[in-house]
């Protein structure tokens, strides 16, 4: 290695953290890190409280890191038909680039779904016996009653209270150090995400008795599939409430007095979103050039909306598909592999070449 570069190399993580605009949730970068000590010391932007928790609970950090892929995939599912599709940047420690420097509705959703993802990942790891600091919910013991009568707590109830508590301590740590509008917004949306997971905690039971008479029941609490949380937060995104800081700077109020004050379950934002039509570094917009659009749709994924009126290119592609499926007794369905030709429509690039500049 070149001698001058050899001297600089040990300082690159610090240099990177200094050069990149500060984004609150640098812990998202944990999905790409290695061992716990390397992760705790080199993830840019972690505050001291987050590093303390990271060193103290390496097994929890592994669960959080694995969970990043899950909630980013859910974000991409929810936005799959929109101009901004929750695409991540592998070489950016914020995952989403400058998008999160804006206090937009999209930023609100990302903070909420990521906070929810941490709760879900930690709680699941607790129930699976992967964490030293928690296990199944210790409070769910003995006998209890519901609308169907008496039952015994059994099995392994998901310890969601631990997941919520740890997620709040870790995720909110950096926001609590700031008193600005963005910090307050992020804290609110983080909490909304945590509450969303808990909202879908459901009681599951197993019956015991002769011929399934259910004379005895054993029950436990279980989290629903994360898709339910994603769908719920998506509805909250569509109904997100624009707010402004109050006069003393300790909270916010609705920007439009015709709207009700946001509840703890609502998502809030300060800034209007860009249209995401063209690549814009400052707005965190990747643009829609090259995105696949639906020629027959009238929704957000239509070629007219997705391509922002620029038009689209059409290419003929072939794909392998199942065909001539037949049911065979008993009990299988057998199909042939067939080649299918179809048209794929992709959005044209703007006439200006600026869109092609990499972010």
Curated annotation (Swiss-Prot):
The keyword Manganese does not apply. Residues 1-25 form the signal peptide. Ligand for members of the frizzled family of seven transmembrane receptors. Probable developmental protein. May be a signaling molecule which affects the development of discrete regions of tissues. Is likely to signal over only few cell diameters. A lipid is attached at residue 211 (O-palmitoleoyl serine). This is Protein Wnt-2. GO terms for cellular component: extracellular space. InterPro entries: Wnt, Wnt2, Wnt_C, Wnt_CS. GO terms for biological process: animal organ development; canonical Wnt signaling pathway; cell fate commitment; neuron differentiation. Pfam families: wnt.
